[in-house]
Every structure is written in C-alpha cells, then in structure tokens.
C-alpha cells in the first residue's frame, strides 16, 4: 500500500481498496430483490432518457481539446478507473440517483478534467444521466451552446428571476448536462453559503431519480465554505494532484468531511497528449 493509501486509511478508519466496486454484504434473498429492483428501475429510466434533447455531439477534436477520455483515443487503462468509480457511485444509490462532491487537496485544474470525465463516464450508462455543477472557474470551459455568454451558477445566485432550468445546459456528451460557473469574474466563494445555492443543489439532486450530480468544488483547504456542501452530498471524492500535496495536506482535508460519505481519493496526473491518469484509493 502506498503512503497516500496509508494516510487515507489512518484518517478515515476505512481500509483503502483499489478501484473495484464495494457492495455491502446482505442475505442472498434480499440481495436478489435489490438487484431486481435496480434492473427494473434502470429499464424504466432508459426509456425515459431516450427522449432527452441532444443538440450536438463533440467531435473527436473537441473531445481531445477538452481532455475527455474516449475509446478512439485512449487505452483501456485510462478509462477503467472512471468506470470502477462510476460503478461504486451508481451501485451505492442505484434506485434514487446521488450527489457526488469532488474537491481537491490543493488548487489545481486537474480536478476540472477529472470531474468532467467522471460525469461523462456516468452518462455512458444508458440508464443514467449526469449533471456537472462547476463551482469554480474552469481553465477550459465546456462549450455548451453556440451562444457567447450562457447563464450559469453565479448568474442564478445573483438573479432571483432566473430558474434552475435556465442555467442547465446540454453538452456534447449524450445524457450529460452542465451548470457552468457563470459570467461573473468574481472569485469569491461567498455564494456557497447562500439560500439560492441550497435551493439549486436540492432541486437538481431530487428532481430525477436517474440523475447523478457531480459538484466540482474549490479546494477544500483553500475555501472554508466548501464543507457547507457536505450536507447535500451522498458521497465525497478527494482529488490529489500528483506531487503537489503532502500527507499533512491530505489528512487536514479528510478531517473536514463526514467519514461515512467519503468514497475515496483519486491521485491525478495530467499526461501531455494522452490526457489524465487516475488511481482511485
């Protein structure tokens, strides 16, 4: 086990395991009924999802520019960690969707790439949809429409005339939607504690049972209000940019969240030309 794995184990009290999905043990009959419920629900959801509006799909060139991992350009070893993580998320909340909070130990744009690939991988399951909420400005913003300025999170927070539906936009990935950060250049994180923020997160988290929401939050050790989102999340993932965080940084970050919601940590390394390498602890 690596030093990072040992640190996570020590501060969470949970054994660190490599990317496979963890399914809680239960009597055989209850497990059978649970799986039958999942299959039934996903079949129903798949029929409903087929009617979702999809204005365009990203070209291979756009996928490369935005650092998406996709089958034509990436090896299986790059895609599998995200599939394993998707399985853990969807199996833990298979019948009612879920909200995943993703935050980094230290500020780094690799978390943006991780979040968009996690949301895209969830959406690859035809019985699921994903919604990415960007709570910080991205280095490379997703092209969501042909309009130069689209309404986003901070616009919704500051304008009470806007509805939640006004800031949810399709992406070039089937079944994946995004709420961009917004048009403001204000880097203040004060909006995280606003009533409008609470309303938005509750709305998108409970409206559709087949939707999985990924919240791309600021670094937990830099923005104190990030932990306010803890109450909305079913699961929490901590990203660790390769070579940029100490064991002390990791321990301090983990202590700020509910241990029961802590899904794991992802060690991320951005590789030129090929994209993103992730190891899930």
Describe the residue ranges of each PLM region.
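C-terminal lobe/tail of nucleotide-utilizing enzymes
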Residues: 2-82, 191, 248-281
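P-loop/Walker-type NTP enzyme "switch/lid" segment
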Residues: 56-83, 87, 94, 105-109, ...
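Short, well-ordered alpha-helices that flank and scaffold nucleotide-derived cofactor binding pockets
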Residues: 87, 120, 124, 231, ...
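Short coil/loop residues immediately preceding or within conserved phosphate-binding loops
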Residues: 97
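Hydrophobic/aromatic beta-strand patches that form the interior of the parallel beta-sheet core
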Residues: 100, 131-133, 177-179, 237, ...
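Glycine-rich phosphate-binding P-loop
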Residues: 100-123
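Conserved catalytic-core segment of NTP-binding enzymes
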Residues: 190-281
């Amino acid at each position: 086990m690596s030093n990072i794995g040992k640190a996570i184990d020590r501060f969470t009290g949970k054994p660190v395991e490599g990317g496979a999905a963890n399914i809680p043990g239960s009597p055989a009959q209850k497990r059978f009924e649970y799986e039958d419920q999942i299959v039934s629900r996903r079949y129903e959801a798949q029929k409903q999802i087929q009617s979702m509006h999809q204005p365009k799909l990203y070209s291979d060139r756009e996928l490369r520019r935005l650092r998406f991992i996709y089958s034509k350009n990436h090896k299986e070893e790059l895609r599998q960690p995200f599939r394993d993580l998707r399985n853990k998320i969807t199996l833990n909340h298979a019948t009612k969707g879920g909200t995943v909070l993703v935050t980094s130990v230290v500020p780094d744009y690799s978390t943006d790439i991780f979040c968009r690939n996690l949301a895209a991988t969830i959406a690859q399951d035809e019985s699921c949809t994903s919604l990415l909420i960007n709570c910080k400005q991205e280095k490379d913003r997703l092209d969501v429409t042909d309009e130069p300025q689209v309404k986003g999170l901070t616009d919704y927070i500051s304008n009470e005339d806007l509805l939640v539906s006004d800031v949810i936009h399709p992406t070039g990935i089937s079944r994946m939607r995004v709420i961009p950060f917004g048009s403001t250049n204000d880097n203040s994180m004060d909006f995280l504690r606003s009533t409008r923020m609470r309303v938005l997160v509750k709305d998108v988290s409970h409206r559709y049972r087949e939707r999985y929401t990924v919240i791309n939050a600021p670094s937990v050790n830099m923005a104190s209000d990030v932990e306010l989102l803890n109450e909305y999340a079913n699961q929490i993932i901590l990203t660790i940019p390769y070579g940029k965080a100490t064991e002390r940084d990791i321990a301090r970050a983990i202590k700020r969240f509910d241990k029961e919601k802590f899904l794991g940590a992802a060690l991320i390394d951005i590789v030129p030309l090929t994209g993103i390498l992730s190891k899930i602890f």
